[in-house]
Amino acid sequence: MRGVRFHDMVAGCLRIDLLEPVAARIRPHGWHVQIQLDGDGLVDLAPRLAALPVDVVIDHMGRIPVAGGIERAAFVSLLRLLEGGRCWVKLSAPYHVSRAGPPDYRDCAARARTLVRAAPERLLWGSNWPHPSVRDKPDDADLLDTLADWTDDEATIRRILVDNPVALFGFPAAPS
């Protein structure tokens, strides 16, 4: 076990009001807090996340609605959290917010590329398989292809897929 997940959109999960006491309990173990939330809620939650004594992983690029682009207040909050050096963002599940849809989720590209430029060392990728909350399941190969579209080179892809998870989860270093 490496972290504790808060899912602010599903009943029965850890509640956000428990964030600080749970973070204090997991800190001695070197664990992180992982958050899935309704994206615009990040504006109000960001100061609390920034003050936590543990790393924070934000699921699904924050689930921030695409309207408003990279200027949307919640996305600006996400970038500020990344600048703090204790936040990680998963480049995952663009289907939660995309209006353009598969296979390339083009309306999510500007945000993903902005995250890659801002902090490639703080990004993770995940397929979100088995995609529990969507009726029309995406093609996981297409989702992985979007990562190649959002990044500039193979070194950045390796960083996101291999090096960053090694750093966050404490896995043994992968061979080059």
Predicted segments with their positions:
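Mid-to-C-terminal alpha-helical segments outside catalytic/metal-binding sites
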Residues: 114-122, 135-176
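Divalent metal-coordination and catalytic microenvironments
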Residues: 4, 26, 60, 89, ...
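Small/polar glycine-rich anion-binding or flexible loop at a beta-alpha turn
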Residues: 128-134
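Residue-level detector of flexible, active-site-proximal loop/helix-junction positions
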Residues: 65, 130, 172
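Catalytic pocket-lining loop regions of alpha/beta-barrel enzymes
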Residues: 16-125
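Glycine-rich phosphate-binding "P-loop"
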Residues: 1-13, 133
